Amino acid sequence: MDIRRDFHMAEGEGEWSYSKNCRRQQVAVRETRPMVETAVKQVYAALLPRTMVVADLGCSAGPNTLLFISSVLSSIAAAAAEQCKPPSGGGDDDDHHVELQFVLNDLPGNDFNHLFRSVEEEFRRAAGCERAPHPPYYVMGLPESYYNRLFPRQSVHLFHSSYCLQWRSQEPEGLEAWRKPCLNEDNIYIARTTTPSVAKLFQEQFQKDFSLFLKLRHEELVHGGRMVLIFLGRKNEDVYSGDLNQLFALVATALQSLVLKGLVEKEKLESFNLPVYGPSVGEVEELVTRSGLQFSMDLIKQFEMNWDPFDDSEGDNDVVVVEDSARSSVNVAKLIRSVLKALVVRHFGEAVLDACFAEFRRLVAEHLGKEKTKFTTIAMCLKKE
């Protein structure tokens, strides 16, 4: 599995596309908007850059990037207003006006065509609206893994990444498809039957990747620059108890059913491990501290959202099951299919896609009928001193 080559969200605008099934991420972007706005205002007020470089890492091709761009622009306009200074050109004071360069980054397989069509449509829509002036801004794409260097040293003022850093740069070292015998039989992530030694391989891959990510971004950030990072995690320290564990265990069970039906070779399943890991807040804080880098943590928090991206109910302690598990299971299946499609097709072939996620939907309905499960999200803001 070559993650840089193979991994991307489902393209286009159809029923199964990521752009049509990313509402959960959209809700989270709104949930963390105050965090982004605060970071933008702090960077602007402290540095007063003439050109402010803002990078969205793992932008995908859904509407969430447009929400992020809008949030940054409105925050700059508000910060400029607080300083009694218009954010865009005019008059003799142009040397003090900021221009923004947005850099939208994702892997080369991302649907950048759809992304930039959406950006252009937003440009046109915004041009026809009366709103407070915002600074001039420019948008470019950068197809590359964020586990590589992306920018010159000390050139970026703000990094943003939403629902990406749970993904690893590769399958855990030691679990590659070519290795025999299979060490994580019938599983594709950390499950109840995963041995502690295999769970440790997933943890170590996260530690390696996240430490590298911090190092690279530290080199690229200006002093006083910030990173707002939002990603899936787990709510306690038990590596076997995360919400992702339950979710991907159901995907594995769906694939196992295809093996029993003769649609998938058992060896194929045994050689498939997802490049993913949901850390705890404690693990994240420890890696930031261990890095020895000049990062201060402005904020770190976690919050939960229902598996069903269209279920916004708070779900108090008395509500333990989903009221309409059949409907919710369809929404969950569409979301996970839009995320995993490229990896499943690359490894098992497109012919199994419908059968796999039909069975997954059935399993999710059964699960949600017994237990209302939530995603745990970690949100953090780091400042480079």
From Swiss-Prot:
One of its GO terms (molecular function) is metal ion binding. S-adenosyl-L-homocysteine binds at Y18, C59, N64, D106, L107, S145, Y146. Benzoate binds at Q25, W167. Gene3D superfamilies: Methyltransferase, alpha-helical capping domain, Vaccinia Virus protein VP39. InterPro entries: MeTrfase_7 (IPR005299), MeTrfase_capping (IPR042086), SAM-dependent_MTases_sf (IPR029063). Its cofactor is Mg(2+). Its EC number is 2.1.1.273. Disulfide bonds: none annotated. Signal peptide: none annotated. Keywords: Magnesium, Metal-binding, Methyltransferase, Plant defense, S-adenosyl-L-methionine, Transferase. Mg(2+) binds at N184, E270, F272, N273. It catalyses: benzoate + S-adenosyl-L-methionine = methyl benzoate + S-adenosyl-L-homocysteine. SUPFAM superfamilies: S-adenosyl-L-methionine-dependent methyltransferases (SSF53335). It is an enzyme of class 2 (transferase). GO terms for biological process: defense response; methylation. It comes from the Eukaryota. Belongs to the methyltransferase superfamily. Type-7 methyltransferase family. SABATH subfamily. Methyltransferase involved in the biosynthesis of methyl benzoate in response to stresses. Utilizes exclusively benzoic acid (BA) as substrate. This is Benzoate O-methyltransferase. The gene is OMT8.
